[in-house]
Amino acid sequence: MMILSIIATVVLLGALFYHRVSLFLSSLILLAWTAALGVAGLWSIWLLVPLAIILVPFNLTPMRKSMISAPVFRGFRKVMPPMSRTEKEAIDAGTTWWEGDLFQGKPDWKKLHNYPQPQLTAEEQAFLDGPVEEACRMANDFQITHELADLPPELWAYLKEHRFFAMIIKKEYGGLEFSAYVQSRVLQKLSGVSGILAITVGVPNSLGPGELLQHYGTEEQKNHYLPRLARGQEIPCFALTSPEAGSDAGAIPDTGVVCMGEWQGQQVLGMRLTWNKRYITLAPIATVLGLAFKLSDPDRLLGGEEELGITCALIPTSTPGVEIGRRHFPLNVPFQNGPTRGNDIFVPIDYIIGGPKMAGQGWRMLVECLSVGRGITLPSNSTGGVKSVALATGAYAHIRRQFKISIGKMEGIEEPLARIAGNAYVMDAAASLITYGIMLGEKPAVLSAIVKYHCTHRGQQSIIDAMDITGGKGIMLGESNFLARAYQGAPIAITVEGANILTRSMMIFGQGAIRCHPYVLEEMAAAQNNDVNAFDKLLFKHIGHVGSNTVRSFWLGLTRGLTSHTPTGDATKRYYQHLNRLSANLALLSDVSMAVLGGSLKRRERISTRLGDVLSQLYLASAVLKRYDDEGRHEADLPLVHWGVQDALYRAEQAMDDLLQNFPNRVVAGLLTAMIFPTGRHYLAPSDKLDHAVAKILQVPNATRSRIGRGQYLTPAEHNPVGLLEEALRDVIAADPIHQRICKELGKNLPFTRLDELARNALAKGLIDKDEAAILAKAEESRLRSINVDDFEPEALATKPVKLPEKVRKVEAA
């Protein structure tokens, strides 16, 4: 009985941690339990004395603080990693949303499913069906990329007339004031037609003068610039990146010095600016330049510090000395992008966005706005491109035949085709879910980094898969190619607004560990403020948090999550239970990693990368489950749901295993392995059978396939190869049963070629009627158009000689 009572006590202790019972109530329960066992004669009643001696100090705050919290507090202050001003502002900026739940070890799935699904207003739907549809029709991507290296003038004029650059600007200033959700839908539709078109529209609606002015501008600045930006009268750009500082924006060498100077014939307070920027989208044609620089005030003319820090200003590009106009040439996707320079240019102090009081506040402004822009523009552009590519590649795989069968039926093709379909579904779920948070007023910095990285990365991988499937069709450039420019341009999205290597290895977990953790950020604040009282309360909440996640990790690993709560009992039930387990695992691994490695975790990028991967996969899986629920839980969509969640579970478990295999403290790694994998690893990548079901969805018209491509431009217009492939798919499917019937009548397995000739012969023999012959002829026309590629006269591929800038000759010393 003694052994059973000990086991029961351990189970009770575990249950208290598992359910996160408060310290005081847990202490009372343990004392009562010990007393009951003593009365029953199983334990000595005198055990209450040592137990009380242990528990009382934990529950008496002054004693607990002096004996435990104060020494820990002193040690914590010593090991707390140093944090630069820019890092602190990045962490302090923005908010935590659903990713915070995932990080805490016990996600509230009911809360996730209660987030309202955005609905398009009549105005927003009309914009998508009208101006956006027309802009897609006007865009000829081959002409844009090969002939013009720019949007045609009539398309530029159309975008300005219909206020495409004003989706984020409020109606009071003449803007459209669209929701984040509809902005995402617009960009997805445009990117399925032309990457240049989507980038051109997306950037002014992301991080730029419009966004910064609305949040921080003075009334005078807003009233002057916002109506002009809304009308397209002003073209904005924002210059942050320098040759010497790409991802490390805090190291920008561009400078401004507060001083007095002459402006329009008068002596005014202003700044002398010097900058050298590159990679600035819209800079070559911009009329107003948003500029980030480090501002100093050596004479303290503003009355504050000498070194004010990063500041943002708006500079009309007509200002004498501002250099714009030259262009970069990014991977044959020539959107307007180029350098800008200025040397010792004097401008009034009122050019600072928000006026002089916002001097030195630029980095906070940028980070707060960047989390919104990064969460919409780049993920939406990548997602829209992959959605269109998924439909087109699926159609091509059905239409294209080798060895008398559609190539889409070959297992070698099914594997990458399933990845394309699965990624399109997952990416759209992830890109949509973050817009829900933004519309609720959140500025999710960590989540925007997750979505930016995974949508652009999966987008690139999906484009590579599509190129493997389409072969020569994807390689040969021309108006009928739906893939090559997306393939060429994929690294652009990977690189901009936080290069993906940096985003994955430093930003996702680097910010997530502090911002998403329920206690660490407040503990750091308490340490910085030398507040032992606040630290004491947080410390014991933190200890309970670690204990809870240790118990939850072990128990959910032992039972494979079978006992954990789920919001549904259908085919997705087990996924919620698996995610409950992984969430507890992540919380435990994060706390132990921070405790063992301390400040060095910041430099252990491969460890933080893997922890960030787990958090990311938890988000992607939950986004898939949220999408499935929002769309009505269609059973036909389950193959995509299974693929998306199983892929995420497998990748998350792999990341944890890799982390434990490489954890520097091997003793701790062994203990963690026992806690997290008590019965070993269990999750598998999507099976061949599931890949087959997913790949099949893309190859025939159906409701699930339509949901994959929802909102894309699929009109079979002259310059829309995706729409023409959709039309061809319908034509070929309509012809297929007629072709099979002819084969049966003739007793031959005829190839699915020369259908027009076959139609004439079959009609002459009375095997088909005129309508069926017309269907076969139409299918042959569409089939040939789909599999053929463009060719050109040799001179059509030549370009004009590029005029290089003259090199300045060095003057030799005498």
Swiss-Prot record:
Keywords: FAD, Fatty acid metabolism, Flavoprotein, Lipid metabolism, Oxidoreductase. It comes from Salmonella typhi. One of its GO terms (biological process) is fatty acid beta-oxidation using acyl-CoA dehydrogenase. The active site is at residue 497. Pathway: Lipid metabolism; fatty acid beta-oxidation. Belongs to the acyl-CoA dehydrogenase family. GO terms for cellular component: cytoplasm. GO terms for molecular function: flavin adenine dinucleotide binding; long-chain fatty acyl-CoA dehydrogenase activity; medium-chain fatty acyl-CoA dehydrogenase activity. Catalyzes the dehydrogenation of acyl-coenzymes A (acyl-CoAs) to 2-enoyl-CoAs, the first step of the beta-oxidation cycle of fatty acid degradation. Is required for the utilization of medium- and long-chain fatty acids as sole carbon sources for growth. Is needed for bacterial survival during carbone-source starvation. Gene3D superfamilies: Acyl-CoA dehydrogenase/oxidase, N-terminal domain, Butyryl-CoA Dehydrogenase, subunit A, domain 2, Butyryl-CoA Dehydrogenase, subunit A, domain 3. This is Acyl-coenzyme A dehydrogenase. It catalyses: a medium-chain 2,3-saturated fatty acyl-CoA + oxidized [electron-transfer flavoprotein] + H(+) = a medium-chain (2E)-enoyl-CoA + reduced [electron-transfer flavoprotein]; a long-chain 2,3-saturated fatty acyl-CoA + oxidized [electron-transfer flavoprotein] + H(+) = a long-chain (2E)-enoyl-CoA + reduced [electron-transfer flavoprotein].
